[in-house]
Amino acid sequence: MFGAVRISLHVQCIWSFKRTLDKSDHLYWSAYSGWYSTTDEAFYSDWEVDTSPLGAVSKTSGNQVHWVEEETFRFRLSAFKPKLHVWLDSGVLPNESPEHAGLLALTHKTLDRLEDPCVSRPSSRVPWGIPVPGRIDQTIYVWFDALMNYLTAGGVSFTADGNSQALWPPDIHFVGKDILCFHAILWPAILMALDLPLPKKIIPHGHILVGGTKMSKSLGNVLSPADVLGDLSRALSVSPVHGEVDAESVASDCLRYCLVRSVCLNEDTTFSLPFAKETVNTELVNWLGNLLSRITSKKIAPNQTAPMLDLAEAQQFLSAPADAKFFNDLSQLPFVFDDFWWDRLLPNRSVDAVMHVVRQTNAFVDRHKPWAAGGDGDAQAVVGVALEALRLVGCCLSPLTPYLSNRLLNCLGLHPGKLRGHSWRLDLTHQPLIPRLNV
């Protein structure tokens, strides 16, 4: 969510939120002292500061800090600590992986240590901020200002027109793990003070590393998405056999796919262009693309048609022991995918399940060799099951790779308005799903 902090609506909402907190005695005027980082625009407590050859630095960012004493408005965070501890343990934060469990424990510990934070700064040092109503010597502290963007952009206000909550609260709030303190402590405390609903779930994600280091403008190791998309587009080895290919759409699908495969929702992960190319060539070109090409070939499906069998019907023809697990995994794929994607919020695990079925389908085809069966019932059943697997794969991957998924379904004679029928009628163009990326 992006918002310009100087727009009139946001300024008016900030003032109204501040007045509401004043009336409920959640703000007070007080002296404040602490370690301040100009680079981070944040105060740090003693336990958050370390010494270095450069002097005092933030343990979190490594940026220099200096001691500051000033008078400001402060927020009574201490009044909400008991409620916040209960809320944090209510399941709002994930607790399945060791990384997430560690973040939850750290958030509880941080909450215990935090003092009442400042919500304003002297305008002599921060003249560019939104002024505090009635106090020309104070400006709204940037962290309070930034968090309020969620409410103003979501249509929440405390103006004379009333309190509209059209887009509040969010079902899921994705935040970087380094700003979890703001979003899992300060932000819900403010919402409690304003008597507004809290986010239903907060998902802290890891960082995308470059060369093992978090991306930073100061380090000069930032990867621009536009540059990566350009590199991927230029690496596509498109030939006439691929037909009309939208290189930009293919590159976008590949980048999204690789980012989700990087598991960055659970932990830090290193991203590189060679990794992306290897992932695409292995999983989308070799595993998925080659499966589509051979199962729709005229050697295996000479009439370019096949019956749409359900798995119970297919089992009448196919009884190899390995088929039972494959049929079970295939029938459960939509449910497993949805569980990981929507309920457990682990999209990388969703894609794991899809690629597992792709590999199983390749093994299933190799095991039954429909090209050598002479077009009998067994061969037709193999083709029908493999095509059904491809259909489910295309549907599951559509949120992640919409262009390639649509291309795959078109090859099966399907489209968004028709995802199932009585029989398969394949696309006769036989275009490969995706061009290989030049490494």
Where is each model-derived feature located?
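Alpha-helical scaffold segments in carbohydrate-active enzymes
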Residues: 12-19, 146-149, 287-297, 360, ...
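Short helix-to-loop capping/linker segments positioned immediately adjacent to catalytic or ligand/cofactor-binding
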Residues: 94-96, 336-351
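Short, charged/polar, low-complexity loop and linker segments
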Residues: 268-273, 331-340
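Basic, alpha-helical terminal appendages of large translation-related enzymes
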Residues: 30-35, 56, 339, 345, ...
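Conserved, charged catalytic cores of large soluble enzymes
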Residues: 1-114, 156, 160, 292-337, ...
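Short, mixed-charge aromatic SLiMs
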Residues: 42-46, 208-215, 281-285, 312-328, ...
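Structured secondary-structure scaffolds
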Residues: 11, 32, 57-302, 354
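Secondary-structure capping and boundary motifs in well-ordered enzyme cores
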Residues: 8-12, 135-140, 176-179, 246-250, ...
